[in-house]
Amino acid sequence: MRAVTLKATGRVQGVGFRWATKVAADKCGVNGIVRNLMDGSVFIEAEGEDQRVQVFIDVVRQSPTDFGKVKHLEVHEVEPQNYHDFRITN
């Protein structure tokens, strides 16, 4: 089990980024949350099998929506929170 937090900056709010991230998470088979932050970035917690999480990170890095553009993606390893699905929390 691998768990990460991601912080995506760039054109990531107002472009369907959270919805596309949820779709990508469901396709990759990872659980967690995604939410907008007040600074204009997007925060993601994701967990699942190592390979699935890595594929998800790669999708987010390339932007899960054609309307968005990730300029920078911070990735941090964290302890799993045992999410049961993937949700948009705001």
Curated annotation (Swiss-Prot):
The keyword Hydrolase applies. SUPFAM superfamilies: Acylphosphatase/BLUF domain-like. InterPro entries: Acylphosphatase (IPR020456), Acylphosphatase-like_dom (IPR001792), Acylphosphatase-like_dom_sf (IPR036046). Its EC number is 3.6.1.7. GO terms for molecular function: acylphosphatase activity. Residues 3-90 form the Acylphosphatase-like domain. Gene3D superfamilies: 3.30.70.100. Belongs to the acylphosphatase family. This is Acylphosphatase.
